[in-house]
Amino acid sequence: MGVFRYDPAAKKLGELIASNPRYDMGAAANGSRVAGVLTNAKDNKIVGYRVAGLKPETIWIDEQYAKTQAALDSTLKDRTNLFSRTPDGKALVVNSFSDQAPPRWYLFDEEKRTLEEIAASKPWLDGKLPEQHPFFFKARDGLELTGYYFLPKGAKPGDKFPTIVHIHGGPHARADSWGSGFGVSEARILATRGYAVVLPNFRITPGFGSKAYYSGFGTYGKQMLDDHEDALKWAVGEGFVDSSRVCISGASYGGYASLQMLARAPGLFKCAIAGLAPTDMEYQLTTLEGDTARSEPGVKIWKSILGTEDLGSQAVKDVSPLFNASKIKGAVFMYAGRDDIRVPIAQMYKIERALTSAGNPPVAFVVKEKEGHGFGKLENNLDLYTQILKFLDDQLKPKS
């Protein structure tokens, strides 16, 4: 993946300015911006590029900016230091953070060579967050994929932990990055309570090259799910997983995958946490109660992800948890927002009834009023995670 000069008159690519063999630059394969072209505020000249890999990286082509980066990195050690120039061009705003420390913002005066802290996010957490480990793994078809894992503080080689495989939403979205993201936040909560957590960037996750992205199309409920299992297999091979105590979790697509994996790989996971989950893909893409069916481009891309134009086909039923409820073995925890217009709550009630009819009613189904596709109120999130932790403790019983 690279950034080239472009001649608009000749409509031709020119010289290669910067490249990365693994990560997208400028924009991901799905068109979303994953990394920025950096320009000088004074003259709009291109001075560098930002690569959003497993850890963010800045490639400077301007020598002075490269020297400034080196100076900041030597002062703010063991942190990722991203900076941009103020609109008046007189100073730099620095965003400094790490996997174990929330962001702090500084103002760097180049002329005076002074660095002044101007804001901090949750400074009481500095150094107290669990370490975020990037990893690479190969899917069963040979596709190289990436992810992160977290271990409880004080973990030693040979220690085995109850483990949560957290699946991000989308699925065609980059949900987690270095030090931030819904999955990263959940992993931090769980790791501080004695759990190991694995966050796979499965096929169709943008930002990791066109092959990894486009390999996901047509594999919904199939190879995409294989990747979740293969990430767990990698983690088991690393030696930190207690294979008898593994749960799968996620929201939106991640909630879908959590339910479908219990049906697809019985015995692999003891339990599932499924939030905001589409459970009937035909309903999801046709009901006007939700916003997806109202978007022609949205339905079109979803048909390509499913690999079929026929939403009423048996193939779509086969990858819908609602029609596999009798195969779902293991304890299920569900949650939803009453006002969700992305995944209408009716689907969650459908799977609740289907699981109950199959003799495996959800252990808990948390519904919050005036919440949508994700909970925004602090009190609702506190209650949700209090209940999730109790559920996991009951199912997996961590030693500490």
Please tell me what each predicted stretch does.
Residues 167-169, 336:
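The conserved beta1-alpha1 loop
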Residues 146, 168, 373:
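Histidine-centered divalent metal-coordination motifs
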Residues 161-163, 331:
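The start of beta-strands in P-loop NTPase/AAA+ ATPase cores
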Residues 1-146, 150-160, 171-182, 186-193, ...:
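Peripheral, non-catalytic segments that deliver or gate enzyme domains
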Residues 169-171, 253-254:
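Acidic helix/loop microenvironments that form the catalytic cleft of cell-wall polysaccharide enzymes
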Residues 161, 195, 269-270:
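Short beta-strand segments enriched for Tyr within beta-sheet-rich domains
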Residues 164-166, 197:
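Hydrophobic beta-strand anchors of alpha/beta hydrolase catalytic cores
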Residues 184, 189, 199-400:
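Active-site-proximal cap/loop segments of hydrolase catalytic domains
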